[in-house]
Structure formats: structure tokens, C-alpha cells
Amino acid sequence: MNVKVENIEKNVVKLEITVDSEKFNEAVKKSFKKNAKRFNVPGFRKGKAPLNIIKKYYGEGVLFEDAINFCCEDTYPKAIEENNIKPVDYPQIDVVQIGEGKDFIYTAEVTTVPEVKLGEYKGVEVKKVSYEVEDEAVENELKSMQEKNARVSLKEEGEIEKGNIAIIDFKGYVDGKAFEGGEAKDYEIEIGSGTFIGDFEDQLVGLKKDESKEVNVSFPEEYGREDLNGKPATFEVTIKDIKVKELPALDDEFAKEVSEFDTLEELKSDIKDRMKKELSEKAKAEYEEAVVEAVGANAEIEIPKVMIEKEIENMVRDLEMRLKYQGLDLKSYYEFTNSSEEKVKEYMRETAEKRVKTDLIMQEIAKVEDIKATEEELKEKAMEVAKQYGQKDVEKTAELIANAQKAYLEIDIVNGKVLDLLVENSKEIA
């Protein structure tokens, strides 16, 4: 094998790879073995015609497609390894010369990992991030717990008031016609919750059980459905029942019922401690992000478009998986958000570029600082991931993960070490 390397443009190289005729003929024979059964030549049973007859009957090029694939699969990886080329995408293969008894020559044009020029990455100055737990936040959490533990009972008499729960039947019309999703029976709605569009809920205030009313509202301009966006609608509503929420008193008895604590003060203290921990973790994450951004601002990288496009595709796949867990798909998501695949991808572009840049910088710093993942760290990370799967044989699962996802685990570990290095060497300023 002979390889010539030509720099076409920044981050793009073209390799001209020559495979000697003997090797190519071996690939043709391999192609023949793979495809022999599909050839039907008069005078021979199907799949039994010899190679020389196949070439005469179908032409010598009939076996070239697979032969080319065999040659490329064998020689391309060796060529990029020998020439220290790090591709970020599949190569564009073009045949230069091919034929019986000839050397096989092809070119492989490929986009490569860009050069990263690191600026200052130790000692970057970043503003201190800190949060305080407000008493109001603690009180709001208590109110939320109070709401969750409210007792609900039927309101035998009287009208609907703010805070009541109305059980309703409704049917909606737009342009005088019923529309999909605009009808329900025995629907529970808390008046004042803002669940329904416009002032729908406010128009139910004052109604009694078994009363009906025509409610007029307008859908928001960005409602998410083209047939409803910005359109006025009329709903026929009937009150089936009215319920009242009775909030429990915020006292020691409440604390005993909803927690492991004996007094309300102990519960408040626990809520405050949990909030402090959450805010501390939030501050830490924001500070780390600010450090990485500062390091990124000092670096110079010309990122190939293909790397950004690949990251966008990864982000779309992640979105698709998250939606799947919620019983949705991308089509439904686009309709609900009044968006499209193109709009979502464009929205993701800035984040994708930021992620790619960060990854490249982290990898370069790891190389400069000689930061690597040890075998012990890989085992620990694999075990950590395995525990999340909830399998009985955690050790076996960890072993499988360590083998199948080693590259991803290494990146995760190394990036974590690089982040620690950057944070430890940063300067926190007020």
C-alpha cells in the first residue's frame, strides 16, 4: 500500500491510496465467494459458474463494488493511522484507477479534527457565584406541601369561588365547528390555576352545580396548533360538581404527618438545609461553567461545519429519546411547539457549537497536561453507570459497560479531571 497526503483546505485532507494489483485480485476473489450464489450462467447450475466464466458473461466489473469495499475497509484505517490523521466524519471515496491486473487507486477526502490553539487556561478570573436561602422560599415550599396534603370535599351548596375545584363537561367550537381535543367530560379544573386559556376559569366563578354557561375566549397566537392559533372559541360548559380544598394547619401535627420530624420548626430547618445544598450545587455548576467559558474565550479554534452538524444530530436523537419516554414523538413535538425540524436544529446550533468547542478544548488540555483515565477509574465509572440500570448482577453489568463503552467512559473521566484542574487554578473574584 502506498499513500500520498494532500492538504485540500483547512481541516480537510485528501489521501491517494494505491493497492497493488495482487491485493486487489484477492479482494475480487473474496467478492466472488460472497456473491457466487446470485449468478445464473447458462450451462451451469446457479451459483456454480467459475470466476473466469462469471467475468466473461457479466463483465470484469461485476465484482468490483464489493472488492472496492474490501480494499477500502482494509487500507483506509491503516492509512489514517500511519499518517496520524484524525477524521471527524466518514471519508468521500473516489476511484482513480481500477481494472483487471492493475493497481487499484482511490482517493479518500476527509475532514479532520481542527487545531486547537490554547490561550490562558490556568488562572482565569471568574466572578464568585453564591446564593442565599430566602425565608420566602422556605414558606413557599411549606405552602406547596400544604397544598399536596389538602383534603378535598364536595361543596354541597353555594357558587364556584377562586380556589375551588370544578368538575365540568365542556365542548369547544371554532368558527362554529367542534374541533379535535376540544371536548371532555368530568374534567377537574382548579379555578385560578391558569390551566385553561385566557379567562376561561374566571368566567366560571359564580356558577352553581348543574348550571351551564357559554364561555368565550381566544387561543394565544402561539398556541401550537395552526388550526387554533389566535382564533376565538366558544365553549359550552356544564358544572357537574364543585369541590372545596381544605388546607391542613401548618403546625407540629402537620410536620409529624408529612415528615420524620416532630415539630414544624424542625421541618422548616430541614427544608432550609436541603435548599442550601441545592443552591450550593447550583452555584458550583455555574462557577464551573463560567470557568470553562473563560478558558474557551481565550482559545482559537476553527470548527468544521460537519462536527457541528453531527452534534446537532446527536441532540435531536437525545430529544427523540426523551420524548419517547413521555409517549411522544418528534412530529407531535413539532406540532405542539409550532416548530419544525429545521427550526429546532437551528435553535440547537449555538449550543452544539459550544459543546464541540468545549470538548476540543478539554481534549487539548488533557493532551498538554498528560491527563488520562486509569483502569481503576474506568472500573469505578462503569460500576457507577451499572448501578443506574438497576440490574441484579451489577458487577457483570459493569463489566459489559466497561468493554462496550470504554471510549465514552474515558472521555467522561478525563473531562472531569480537566475541569477539576481548571477550577482549582482559577481565581475567584467578587
UniProtKB/Swiss-Prot annotation:
Top-rank EC class of the record's enzyme: isomerase
Domain PPIase FKBP-type: start-end pairs: 163-248
GO cellular component terms, semicolon-separated: cytoplasm
Biological process, per Gene Ontology: 'de novo' cotranslational protein folding; cell division; chaperone-mediated protein folding; protein transport; protein unfolding
A GO term, aspect molecular function: protein folding chaperone
Swiss-Prot/TrEMBL keywords: Cell cycle, Cell division, Chaperone, Cytoplasm, Isomerase, Rotamase
Family matches, as InterPro entries: PPIase_dom_sf, PPIase_FKBP_dom, Trig_fac, Trigger_fac_C, Trigger_fac_C_sf, Trigger_fac_ribosome-bd_bac, Trigger_fac_ribosome-bd_sf, Trigger_fact/SurA_dom_sf
UniProt cross-references to PROSITE patterns, sorted A to Z: FKBP_PPIASE
Alphabetical list of PANTHER family matching this protein: TRIGGER FACTOR CHAPERONE AND PEPTIDYL-PROLYL CIS/TRANS ISOMERASE (PTHR30560), TRIGGER FACTOR-LIKE PROTEIN TIG, CHLOROPLASTIC (PTHR30560:SF3)
Function: Involved in protein export. Acts as a chaperone by maintaining the newly synthesized protein in an open conformation. Functions as a peptidyl-prolyl cis-trans isomerase.
This protein's name: Trigger factor
